[in-house]
Amino acid sequence: MWAYAIKAKKVIATDVSSLHELQKLEKDADWLWIDCFEPNPEEFQLVSELLCIDEKILDDMKMGRAFPRYKKHNDCTLLSISVATIQNELKTYPIYIGVKERLVMTTRKPGSSKPVERTIQTVKDCVEEMEKANPTFVVCEVLRETSNENLEVMMALREVIETVEEEAIARPSRKALTKKVFALKREIAVLYRLLWSEEQMMSSLKDGLIPNLEPCEASVLGLKDAMDNISRELEFLNSYDNALDGILRLQDLGMIHRVEKTLIYLTIVIVAMNLILIAMEIGILDLLLGL
C-alpha cells in the first residue's frame, strides 16, 4: 500500500502498512492519496478503518462488485469505476475511489491499473504548477484516464466486427458465425452500459452533485471533453450493433436461399418421378392393348 503525501507542492511517496502511519501522514500533509494494488485482507481492513465504511460496502469491494452511483457513508464518498479490456473476450475490472476530507484512496487490480498509474504520474509531474491539486483532481483524472482506456477497447472491438463481416460475406451460412455475432452483441451491450454509467458519473461530478467533490474549472473542462468523446463512442456502438444485425439478416437471406434451392431440387425430383410413373403407365397400357 503506497501513500502519496502532498505538502507544499511536493509529492512524498511512502510504503505504509499500519493505520498509525496513515493517520500521521494525513495529519502532516496538505492532502493524502493512498493507493492499494490488489489489497490483501489486512489492507482491506485498513481501508475500512480509515474510511469508516460498513461491512456490506467492504464485501462489495472485496468481491469486485460495481455500484452504478456513488455511495455515501458517514463522511466518506465512494465511487466505483470499471475498466474494460478485450483480448479473446471483453472483461471489466473495478477501481474503487474513496474521498474523505483531505484524503483520497484508490484500490485496483492488474486489469484496472493503467488509469491510476497515469494519474499518479500526472500528479507527480504537475503538482508544482497546479494551484488546485486536491483529492477531487485525482478523481477527475482517474475518470478521464479510465474513459480513454475504455475508448481504446472500441478500436479493438471494431476490428473484430470487421473480421466477422468479412467471414459473413465469404461464408454466410456458417453456424459458428451466428454464435460470434451474438457474443459480440452481448459485449457491445456491456460496454454501452459501462460507458453510459461513466458519462452519468462525470455529469454528476461536473455539476457538483457528488458529496466531498468540488472540481476546479480545468477539471470541469476535462470532464466535458471526456463526456463528448463518450457520447460519440456510444453512437458508434449503436452503429456496430446495427452492423451485427445486418450480418444476422444476411444469414437469414442465406438460409432462405438454401431452402429455395432445396425446394427447387425437390420439385425437379417430384417432376422426374411423375414423368417416370406416367411413362410406366403408358408402357403398361401399350402392353395391354397389344394383347
Q: Which sequence ranges carry the predicted segments?
A:
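Bilayer-spanning, highly hydrophobic alpha-helical transmembrane segments
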Residues: H257-L291
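Peripheral, non-transmembrane regulatory/ligand-interaction domains of membrane transport proteins
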Residues: M1-I210, D225, N229-S239, Y265-I268, ...
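Membrane-interface, cytosolic juxtamembrane amphipathic helix immediately N-terminal to a transmembrane helix
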Residues: L234-V269
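Charged, long alpha-helical assembly modules
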Residues: E217-N242, R258, L285
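Hydrophobic alpha-helical transmembrane segments
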Residues: S204-D225, N242-L248
